[in-house]
């Protein structure tokens, strides 16, 4: 009789014991020297995983009793990394982070281990974001990782308006010529306008003028001067005085300026590249006058006072929420004829005009507030049913593709007003909740730290309004809460609230702001409002119509301006500020 027995995980058992022997310096027959550190290992193990070691053994005709010594330059691989590599060779396990991925790639290159290179490639793909895409592109070019290079390049192209801004330019000025030229040549480059592209080129050249002046002539050809404002053209002309062999470029600039003096003024928008960004307010979903739920997505182009339809949502809903992050708009929740609180979540790609289904929210929500902070999408508060409020703050984890509970507000509320400060803090200001059995807005400010998941500061103040307030930071530590009946300045440092005489005028249709309106701050103390319910003071609350107009409030003057009317009058639509690429205008 014959029986075969197989040990479970025997290979792992053997390698674990060999690794213990390595660390105890037992039975070693090779050593790796890095700086003043010596690491002992077994030739057979490393020869099995590294073609480099196998080649050294065979080319030197090493005998069984011979010992192999390898000296590694510490400027190429650190002792810490060599120790990590040896652990990986013996166990097949490695922990990759943004801090060690470059050295691990060097190790994979040095020892010629393609499996480790694949792991590093996968890590870079999964962890890429706006903050690291420039560094990742450098790594991809250095180690010839095409997939990473393509994704990182797209990240830089889609966020060029950030990298060319004062906030991001400190790192971007070190961009290699081959990458910088490729970006300027890209028609889909996401610049604020062609002025930013020309200014970025000049600043990039002057950052290392002696080395980069030779690239100016070639890169200048990628700029459409007809799309550049007179002010920036004059700025560029003055800068060219400090460069050699730029007389022809100066002549081109002067020619454009001269032509403009002789022709009728026209919008520069028609000359912008396809990727140039338009500040826009995007309206999604809502309920129509006869009760039908809407799935339309409309954009108001601020610069042109123009409405256009972008797309149709994958579902019809009102009281949903939306926020933008880069080229994407995220939507979630809402109510329909059948379901009062939807869990569904979607992402709209403004560049490709396409929708992607996201994992559902953990609970169905209406009147929640979506917001983007530090490039991450959050959902704040909301209702799961009439008079049932939640305090949950959810975060969407792009890498794991899941909604996570990030923390909780101090009070369960819906219809909250939220403003961000920096890349870390959310200020959640007032909201609706049950007070002594009645739905009421409460005077509370929660400072939520997205890094720790805690409400690090909670301030309460007497509230005399039940309308949705407008928020702004007039000074670094002064949060302004403006409403129709009462306005408050909250000193976050002194934890003190003070009433002010400034108030928000009611809408031109004599209605106050509430959760049914689409409200969006668009910068420069201006606030966009459209849709919502219109009620008159001399009729019962049940008699209402839907506001068919759009308005713009200048908070500096306290006056409303009537804008171009939206395509449809909608109650409780979602609303967010977004930067749309110019190419969408070609759809009109």
Curated annotation (Swiss-Prot):
The lineage of its organism: Eukaryota, Metazoa, Chordata, Craniata, Vertebrata. Interacts with CYLC1; the interaction may be relevant for proper acrosome attachment to the nuclear envelope. Changing residue 432 to W: In SPGF91; pathogenic; in spermatozoa, undetectable in the postacrosomal region, suggesting that it could be degraded or shed during spermiogenesis; when tested in knockin mice, which also carry variant 447-C--I-588 del, a setting similar to that of the original patient with this phenotype, animals develop normally, however, males are infertile and their spermatozoa show a substantial decrease in motility; spermatozoa from homozygous male mice exhibit several abnormalities, including abnormal head shaping, with an increase in their length and width, apical defect of the acrosome and nuclear lacunae devoid of chromatin; at the flagellum, mutant spermatozoa display mitochondrial sheath misassembly and coiling tail around the nucleus. Signal peptide: none annotated. Residues 133-235 form the BACK domain. GO terms for cellular component: Cul3-RING ubiquitin ligase complex; cytoplasm; cytoskeletal calyx; nucleus. It is found in: Cytoplasm, Cytoskeleton, Perinuclear theca, Calyx. This is Calicin. Kelch repeats lie at residues 280-327, 328-375, 377-423, 425-475, 476-525, 526-580. Transmembrane segments: none annotated. Coiled coil: none annotated. It holds the Pfam family BTB. The modification Phosphoserine is found at residue 149. Gene3D superfamilies: 1.25.40.420, Kelch-type beta propeller, Potassium Channel Kv1.1, Chain A. Keywords: Cytoplasm, Cytoskeleton, Developmental protein, Differentiation, Disease variant, Kelch repeat, Phosphoprotein, Repeat, Spermatogenesis. Residues 12-124 form the BTB domain. Required for both nuclear and acrosomal shaping during spermiogenesis. It is linked to Spermatogenic failure 91: An autosomal recessive, male infertility disorder due to globozoospermia and asthenoteratozoospermia. Patient sperm show defects of the head, including a misshapen rounded head and detachment of the acrosome, and the sperm fail to attach to the zona pellucida of the egg. The keyword Thylakoid does not apply. Expressed in testis, in spermatozoa (at protein level). GO terms for biological process: cell differentiation; proteasome-mediated ubiquitin-dependent protein catabolic process; spermatogenesis. One of its GO terms (molecular function) is ubiquitin-like ligase-substrate adaptor activity.
């Amino acid at each position: 009789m014959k029986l075969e027995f197989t040990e479970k995980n025997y290979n792992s058992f053997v390698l674990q014991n060999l690794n213990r022997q390595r660390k105890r310096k037992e039975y070693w027959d090779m050593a790796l020297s890095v700086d003043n550190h010596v690491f002992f290992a077994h030739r057979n193990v490393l020869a099995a995983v590294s073609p480099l070691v196998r080649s050294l053994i065979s080319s030197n005709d090493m005998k069984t009793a011979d010992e192999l010594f390898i000296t590694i330059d510490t400027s190429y691989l650190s002792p810490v990394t060599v120790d990590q590599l040896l652990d990986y060779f013996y166990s097949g396990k490695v922990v990759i982070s943004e801090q060690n991925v470059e050295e691990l790639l060097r190790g994979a290159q040095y020892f010629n281990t393609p499996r480790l290179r694949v792991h590093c490639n996968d890590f870079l793909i999964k962890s890429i974001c706006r903050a690291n895409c420039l560094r990742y592109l450098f790594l991809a070019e250095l180690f010839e990782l095409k997939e990473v290079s393509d994704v990182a390049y797209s990240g830089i192209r889609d966020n060029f308006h950030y990298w060319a801004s004062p906030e991001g330019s400190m790192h971007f000025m070190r961009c290699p010529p081959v990458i910088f030229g490729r970006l300027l040549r890209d028609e889909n480059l996401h610049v604020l306008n062609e002025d930013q592209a020309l200014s970025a080129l000049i600043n990039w050249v002057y950052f290392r003028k002696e080395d980069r002046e030779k690239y100016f002539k070639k890169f200048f050809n990628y700029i459409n001067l007809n799309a550049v404002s007179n002010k920036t053209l004059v700025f560029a002309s003055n800068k060219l005085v400090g460069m050699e062999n730029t007389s022809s470029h100066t002549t081109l600039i002067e020619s454009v300026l001269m032509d403009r003096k002789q022709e009728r003024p026209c919008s520069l928008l028609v000359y912008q590249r396809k990727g140039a960004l338009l500040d826009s307010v995007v309206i999604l979903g809502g309920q129509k006058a006869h009760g039908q739920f809407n799935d339309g997505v409309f954009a108001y182009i601020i610069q042109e006072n123009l409405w256009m339809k972008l797309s149709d949502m994958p579902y019809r809903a009102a009281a949903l929420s939306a926020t933008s992050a880069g080229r994407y708009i995220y939507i979630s929740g809402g109510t329909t004829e059948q379901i009062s609180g939807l869990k569904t979540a979607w992402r709209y790609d403004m560049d490709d005009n396409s929708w992607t289904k996201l994992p559902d929210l953990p609970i169905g929500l209406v009147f929640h507030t979506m917001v983007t902070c530090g490039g991450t999408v959050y959902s704040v508060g909301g209702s799961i049913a009439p008079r049932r409020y939640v305090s949950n703050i959810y975060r969407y984890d792009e890498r794991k593709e899941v909604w996570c509970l990030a923390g909780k507000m101090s009070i369960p509320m819906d219809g909250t007003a939220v403003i961000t400060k920096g890349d870390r803090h959310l200020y959640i200001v007032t909201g609706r909740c049950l007070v002594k059995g009645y739905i009421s807005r409460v005077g509370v400010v929660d400072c939520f730290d997205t890094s720790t998941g805690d409400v690090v500061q909670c301030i309460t103040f007497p509230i005399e309004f039940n309308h949705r307030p407008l928020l702004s930071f007039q000074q670094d530590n002064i949060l302004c809460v403006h409403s129709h009946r009462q306005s408050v300045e909250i000193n976050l440092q002194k934890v003190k609230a003070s009433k002010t005489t400034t108030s928000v005028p009611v809408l031109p249709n004599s209605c106050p702001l509430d959760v049914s309106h689409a409200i969006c701050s668009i910068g420069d103390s201006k606030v966009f409002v459209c849709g919502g319910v219109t009620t008159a003071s001399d009729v019962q609350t049940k008699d209402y119509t839907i506001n068919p107009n759009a308005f713009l409030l200048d908070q500096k003057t306290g006056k409303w301006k009537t804008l171009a009317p939206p395509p449809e009058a909608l109650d409780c639509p979602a609303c967010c500020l977004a930067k749309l690429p110019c190419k969408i205008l070609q759809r009109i």
